[in-house]
Amino acid sequence: MTDGPIKVNSEIGALKTVLLKRPGKELENLVPDYLDGLLFDDIPYLEVAQKEHDHFAQVLREEGVEVLYLEKLAAESIENPQVRSEFIDDVLAESKKTILGHEEEIKTLFATLSNQELVDKIMSGVRKEEINPKCTHLVEYMDDKYPFYLDPMPNLYFTRDPQASIGHGITINRMFWRARRRESIFIQYIVKHHPRFKDANIPIWLDRDCPFNIEGGDELVLSKDVLAIGVSERTSAQAIEKLARRIFENPQATFKKVVAIEIPTSRTFMHLDTVFTMIDYDKFTMHSAILKAEGNMNIFIIEYDDVNKDIAIKQSSHLKDTLEDVLGIDDIQFIPTGNGDVIDGAREQWNDGSNTLCIRPGVVVTYDRNYVSNDLLRQKGIKVIEISGSELVRGRGGPRCMSQPLFREDI
């Protein structure tokens, strides 16, 4: 089969094309009173966050990676006036809780904007002062203090989550939290309408109308045969089973097994990739809490049973044994965050020490602040490329969270 614009058959194959989102004005629309609702713990300093992100992108380019930007692709996808109108309608339809009946006033504002300005405005949010209509509904008098008609989308620079490249297809995800639910609208329009993608017949393994939640940070492509997916607060068992069935029934898909790994439902264990990432053929970074749970984990291996013409599910409690079995590797190495130290490990886990981006086998991008983890990776033969992330990390995501591979070389 001829390669299309999406091909990801591993976590470690040489990264050739990646999707990023440069932090924008949405970060400056974060205010302390509404941080929890927008899933932030702190407010990044935009100017520094942009410099850090620009350096991240430049590091990838220097390693031979083509960098695409979500905001640019989205604007290029709505050149057709009818598509632009449908895009606006879809965004507003998912913002009714805050719009309070002022769709027409917001559309009037949007009509004054270019396509790029429109996308940027939707991402950054619409303040009430930009519309400034008179209160016409009781709910507006009651909710007068809330400053937005359209919430900002500060999590967008974590492009890993609203979508996931799997094989030559993609999942367009239904996000768990309302604050992030609109994010996958952008990739939906990009895949359907952008010249680079629209005629490529890209399989949509799951779309954003799926009734079950799934997020890309829980979706790991371990090999052309094996997916690992976290069962987490943000990714449901129902979504994983639906994805497995869709992939198994597609004759062009190569995947034979889906490994579902249950992780705790807490912010520290937000997604599977915050506690567990593949960095070489036989090496994984690992949060020490996962290592301590070895032998008591809930792991499920989903396969297609040709005899019964249905999926079959096996259970395991040992992650190391499971990975060695499904990947056909004799001795997998787990490299603990912060060397497993009770203090260093907890601190570096909070700063996404396990959330490494592998750009080819044995070569990773990490935050420089996680020096204990980085030194240990080097001792294990891994080449570590460090980036600064003092502001970026305030969003609780690392290099893997901030990137969506679109194309990797096969291994």
From Swiss-Prot:
Catalytic activity: L-arginine + H2O = L-citrulline + NH4(+)
Keyword set includes Cytoplasm: yes
List of catalytic residues: C401
Entry GO terms, CC: cytoplasm
Annotated compartments: Cytoplasm
GO biological process: arginine catabolic process to ornithine; arginine deiminase pathway
Main location: cytoplasm
This protein's pathway: Amino-acid degradation; L-arginine degradation via ADI pathway; carbamoyl phosphate from L-arginine: step 1/2
GO molecular function: arginine deiminase activity
Enzyme Commission identifier(s): 3.5.3.6
Pfam families assigned: ADI
Keyword set, alphabetical order: Arginine metabolism, Cytoplasm, Hydrolase
HAMAP family linked: Arg_deiminase (MF_00242)
Entry's family note: Belongs to the arginine deiminase family.
UniProt xrefs under NCBIfam families: arcA, PRK01388.1
Name this protein carries in UniProt: Arginine deiminase
The organism of origin for this protein: Staphylococcus aureus (strain JH9)
Gene of this entry: arcA
